[in-house]
Amino acid sequence: MENKSTDLFIKTSLLKKKYNIYSNNNNFSFVISKSLFYFIFLKLCIFLYLLILLLHDHKRQKKEFNSIISLLEKFQFKNKNENENNFGTNDIFLDNYETDIYNRIKKKLLAFPCDGMHKNQREFLNGVVRKFRPKKILEIGVREGCASSIMLNAIQDVDDSHLYSIDLDKRDFIGKCVYKLFPNFLSKWTLYKGNIAAKYMEKIGKDIDMVFIDSAHLEPGEILDFIMVLPFLSEEAMIVMHDIANQITATKRFKGWLGKRNEWAPYIIFNSIRGKTYLPSGKNLLTHDIGAKRLYFNQKIYFHDYFRVLGGQWQYFPKEEFINEMKEYIKKYYDSDCLSIFNETVDFNRKFVKQNPINNIYNDNNINTK
């Protein structure tokens, strides 16, 4: 009996030594006290309770998420552009132009001192018109009328087709190429001079199938032009823009090359327009200086985005009378949010252009003083 007691004492002592347990009354106790055990047990219960709530909430959130996705899919079904689905995101290169009809006037155009459109740009413009055969074309920015002549020539065999051209400049040389070289085209041409596009849009009317924009190049230039014509365009209208890479391609071999480096407006709005992109064939996507966009359906869902593009720092400020005309136009054809964005942008840039000496130089470049 004594041996058993001795063995028990030795084992107890060893356990105390192993777990470093000591007691004042020399009674053996376990490492975890009752209070610590209850505390851990309580924590475990709380954790399990929260886990159950989380799993339940996850199921509820998943159900709500699926219902939202279902609603979005219904919305997208109504508003998603068919072309956007079918075309994907790749650009389309017009490799094979119909050039026969252009070749008829090519020599005459080359002999006439005309605006700066290179051979491939002229062929591209002709190719777009021949491919899509628009009935109603609008041109903004005419100058001598080289592009006007190309488009008029391209629609000679398109029944009931007509070109409307607008230029802010009202001097005599505007459209001279058409008047002098191609008077036989005049039956399909209407020219407006001396005011902004908003002034003439109601006269021209809706269902415009194609727009060619080649105007100020400085901001807000082509951005404003696009906003002014947008409410009058047909579904899937073609937007063709020239000089969309001036800020990249301008080098010292061009007259006024340094100024061209600041010509961002065509690049900005062309790459903001929601539509399928058409470019001349070539490897370098950045340096194509002409391109086209075929608008996606339901452009109204992009209206606010287009007005926000105006929010940059303008390089010139239009005449106040033009600003007022545009305000009335926007009030009539866009919603109140678009008008608010326009007003805020105008107020900012009115101060900015006047205070910035660099922009005051652009303010005197005859864009808004003709």
Regions found by a protein language model. Name each.
Residues 14, 18, 111-370:
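S-adenosylmethionine/decaboxylated-SAM
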Residues 91-117:
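Class I SAM-dependent transferase core
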Residues 2-96, 100, 299-364:
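Membrane-proximal basic amphipathic "stem/tether" segments
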